Amino acid sequence: MKKALFLILDQYADWEGVYLASALNQREDWSVHTVSLDPIVSSIGGFKTSVDYIIGLEPANFNLLVMIGGDSWSNDNKKLLHFVKTAFQKNIPIAAICGAVDFLAKNGLLNNHSHTGNFVYLWKDYKQYKPISSFVEKQAVRDKNLVTANGTAPIEFTNLILEMIDFDTPENIEKMMYMNRYGFYHFCDKYGNPFVD
């Protein structure tokens, strides 16, 4: 079974990973787990979450790292940086959104990838941010095994991740995202009612 680790820090943005987590968790070939610096974290929306793994005790093998944004990514924790750098070195598919992209920029981990984020101006003082490719002003960007997105793009973020991991056919992924973006009735107008033969 493939394993997705959702990296959530305290005050994580709970809306950013829900489309992806629910898609993965409904499949028999994927399992969803949480990892953090602390055993219990709270979301911006007030959800207390007991995480599955503490950084340093996470499984050695996993198939996807999803870094959920929030208010704690200005973190200089060495264990956190080592964990993320190791995932890059292992060429594990990685997805980062919102404040998590800021963390990657600050630590020079975007330099070899096309990328987006909340706003490039926020990174002007990051000494390690020396990208080969320019910042892309799009909701979400995929380059090789990395997806980045701004905090208002959970659906676009999910779409590119599902494509990156070959979750389903492009057509089926597009249908799933269409329903999430426009709702059930617009979906029925375009594709027909999935509950009626």
UniProtKB/Swiss-Prot annotation:
Residues 29-166 form the PfpI endopeptidase domain. One of its GO terms (molecular function) is peptidase activity. Keywords: Hydrolase, Protease. GO terms for cellular component: cytoplasm. Coiled coil: none annotated. CDD domains: GATase1_PfpI_3 (cd03140). It holds the Pfam family DJ-1_PfpI. The active site is at C98. It comes from the Bacteria. It is an enzyme of class 3 (hydrolase). GO terms for biological process: proteolysis. Its EC number is 3.2.-.-. InterPro entries: Class_I_gatase-like, DJ-1/PfpI, Prot/Nucl_acid_deglycase. Belongs to the peptidase C56 family. PANTHER family: DJ-1_PFPI DOMAIN-CONTAINING PROTEIN, PROTEIN/NUCLEIC ACID DEGLYCASE DJ-1-RELATED. This is Uncharacterized protease YdeA. It comes from Bacillus subtilis (strain 168). The gene is ydeA.
